Structure formats: structure tokens, C-alpha cells
């Protein structure tokens, strides 16, 4: 079953340098499940560590994502490198190949479980909003945001917004989640997500 519509064929991707880091901006015309999962996967596969990220859905379903990224190998982000990232995103957005097939192209990706600083995972339904809140504090490592978004995708959860920041090797991620149009997550689902996250953090 196709998860992404034809509107995903068109999106804007741009970047600007910021010291040793880069500001990467992605604008997508329609919010659909799996966007963040695919974007974080491609950046990780291309050797980019996400230092900060802000994902937001604004009016008319337009999605604007901002990433602060840094190369894991010390290379520069060039127009050619950006074009490769864009091509891979387009292939995933159009579902020319599956996420699993794509990640299998990169068998040497360093998905490692840290041994220090036990993670803190807090997931709850506040009464003030019609979304579920997920807060995570854990040791940073390459591909972490991709792994988190992968779990949420597998639970068929829509990520409305994310704020991700890394300070002194510790990442603090805050997500707004929901199912369908305005459905908060059930207690059972929240517990399953929490346990799945603790297994990989």
C-alpha cells in the first residue's frame, strides 16, 4: 500500500554553512507519515550527524524541517552531495524502493547501543493538547534520531513536530505524536513504544 501521495514528488531542499556544521532546510507540500523516518535515514546513510532538528507542520499541511548537521567524516556539504541526498529522498518518497531495501545498501552504518547514562523516556497524554508527548534524554550517537523515528513509524504513529538538541554528548528530543487526525496514543501503545525505545537507547 502506498503511504505517500504524488505530491511528494516535489519538495525543496537547501543548505547553508554554519562553521563546521550546515543548516539543511526541507520543505514538503504535504504532511504524511514516514517523512521524518525517511529523511533521517538518508542523512544517516550519507554520513551526516543530526545535531539539532525542528520539524513542524504549518498551514495547509505544508511541512518545514530544519536540521543542523555535521559530517561524521569531516567532509564538506557540496551541491553534488546535496543532489545525491535529494535523489535518495525522492526515491523513498515515491517508494521506488522500500526503506529496508535502502538501508541494506549501507551495511557498515554504525548503529551502536551506548553503555553510559541510562536513558530517560517519558511519554504521556497532556490534557491541554490533543497530542501525545514523548520526551527522551539519552547519550547521543550517529543515527539515533533515525532509530527513534523508525520505531514510531513501525507503530503507525504520526510525528507532528520534533525538537532535537544535543549538548555535551547528551541528546534531548521532544516529540508531539498522534494517530489518525486527532487520536492520542493509548496507554498500551505508549508502554509498547517506551519499552521499544529503551531497548535501543
Report each predicted region and the residues it spans.
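Regulatory modules associated with amino-acid/nitrogen control
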Residues: 1-201
